[in-house]
């Protein structure tokens, strides 16, 4: 009986280990989630892939210099459930986003909301 109990405890604990690493993977602690950054830019790359979509946009800074921003988004299945389609965003499109910038203030964001040019703002996370 003790042998079976030991195995049961072992398998329960082993089941919890992957769950903790999955939660760590989905942490957004590297983003400043208490504030939004507003960006407008032209899409230079778009990756509709699991586990996260990625959009790269070229944004003009205050001096008119182009900088590239990396925008991390939700997974394709999540976005499809929210009404997004893969072809709603394409390279060359101008988009407007509200996102949570990286805490180190580099050019990266966790997408919150996206507005295609001439479209309606919708959640992207």
Predicted feature residues:
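Bacterial N-terminal signal peptides
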Residues: 6-19
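Short boundary/loop segments of OB/S1/cold-shock single-stranded nucleic-acid-binding domains
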Residues: 22-37
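Conserved hydrophobic positions within beta-strands
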Residues: 41-43
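Short aromatic-glycine-enriched beta-strand elements
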Residues: 49-59
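Short, structured beta-strand/loop micro-motifs enriched in basic residues and often containing a Trp
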Residues: 73-81
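Short nucleic-acid-contacting surface segments enriched for D/E, G, S/T with interspersed K/R
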Residues: 81-96
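OB-fold/S1-family single-stranded nucleic acid-binding modules
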Residues: 102-125
């Amino acid at each position: 009986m003790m042998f079976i109990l030991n195995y049961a405890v072992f398998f329960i604990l082993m089941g919890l280990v992957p769950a903790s690493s999955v939660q760590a993977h989905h942490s957004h602690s590297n983003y400043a989630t208490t504030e939004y950054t507003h960006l407008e830019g032209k899409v230079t790359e778009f990756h509709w892939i699991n586990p996260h979509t990625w959009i790269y946009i070229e944004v003009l800074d205050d001096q008119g210099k182009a900088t590239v921003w990396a925008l991390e988004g939700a997974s394709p299945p999540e976005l499809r459930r929210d009404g997004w389609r893969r072809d709603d965003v394409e390279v060359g499109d101008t988009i407007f986003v509200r996102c949570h910038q990286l805490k180190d203030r580099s050019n990266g964001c966790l997408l919150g909301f996206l507005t295609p040019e001439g479209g309606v703002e919708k959640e992207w996370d």
